[in-house]
Amino acid sequence: HPARMVVDIHGMADHHGPDFCLGTGPQPGALEEMAVDILRTELEPFDVAVDSPFDASPHYTVTSLAQQHLGLAGLQIEVAARWRSPHDDAAAPAVSALSSALTVVDELLRDAA
């Protein structure tokens, strides 16, 4: 199957608050909504915000490029710094949860094709 969604993963500073922020971009559609619903469910009990503090709508974001110029769905995922240390076992639950959640998104997007 050809690509249907671009997922752009970023890091954000802890002071922004949530563990994860899902930015749906300037033209979110059904695939973005489905991905957000799945990620919010799969990432429990982490604090998952949507479009705040980062909505991925500025023209320079990968999500915006995908939606407005490539005809693809796009989603930006911001991960708080406290969950991004590759050598910190305390960060492992968030890394594992995000990996599992993205696998579920991938499977459901393939099924929706």
Residue ranges of model-derived segments:
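Catalytic cores of processing enzymes, dominated by hydrolases/peptidases
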Residues: 1-95, 99, 103
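Short, hydrophobic alpha-helical segments
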Residues: 102-112
